[in-house]
Amino acid sequence: QTDLALLEKGWHVVYCEVGNLFGSPKAVVRWDAFYAYLVKEHGFAKKAALEGMSRGGLIIYNWAKANPEKVSCIYGDAPVCDFKSWPGGKGKGKGSAGTWKNCLKAYGLTEKEAMDFKGNPIDGLEVLAKAKVPLFHVIGEADTVVPVAENSDVIEKRYEELGGSIEVIRKPGIGHHPHSLKDPKPIVDFVLRSSKQ
């Protein structure tokens, strides 16, 4: 719904598949090339509004932290913010054993190294707060796949402590799906407002 509403307002919606790279440095490099192509070859704005759903939370945050000057805002929808939570399943969530192995491989980490890793979206938010990148999350309070307490709540607490701006819409009784909102106006307004700053 959000994408369609933005298209109706004249925005471009673009996608670069890196889901199976889990926001790893390889994914960031691929997005760097994609960004350069869009800006240089097609004249796109130099600041992008980033949108990530579920595992997309990993790349939107990790790319933004590597490129804060290129980001107008971040919209995360049921975002994975710590790979130990999903796909790792090291907290309250179920995780996904096969996907966890693929995640470790994408990062070149052992399981022990992954437990000490400090390059998840929940880490190093200072660079985004310093750049005044506004954040917006939509979460289902009953999400058992990507538990809110291990993901979005951690970002919210840490970002506010850093003086960053974050808005969160909580959907009571809703799990990981459906994504977005029946009426995407709050999300669209956030993106439009942030792009004018």
Question: Language-model features: where?
Answer:
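Short beta-to-alpha linker loops that shape the active-site pocket of alpha/beta-hydrolase fold enzymes
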Residues: 12, 17-21, 80, 174
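Alpha/beta-hydrolase active-site loop
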Residues: 22-43
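Short amphipathic alpha-helix adjacent to the substrate-entry channel of hydrolases
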Residues: 1-13
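C-terminal catalytic histidine-bearing segment of alpha/beta-hydrolase fold enzymes
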Residues: 145, 149-197
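Short beta-strand/loop motif that positions the catalytic acidic residue
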Residues: 131, 136-143
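Mobile cap/lid helix-loop segments that gate and shape the active-site cleft of serine hydrolases
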Residues: 85-127
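Primarily recognizes the serine-hydrolase "nucleophile elbow" in alpha/beta-hydrolase
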Residues: 41, 46-98
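The serine-hydrolase catalytic nucleophile loop
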Residues: 1-2, 18, 149
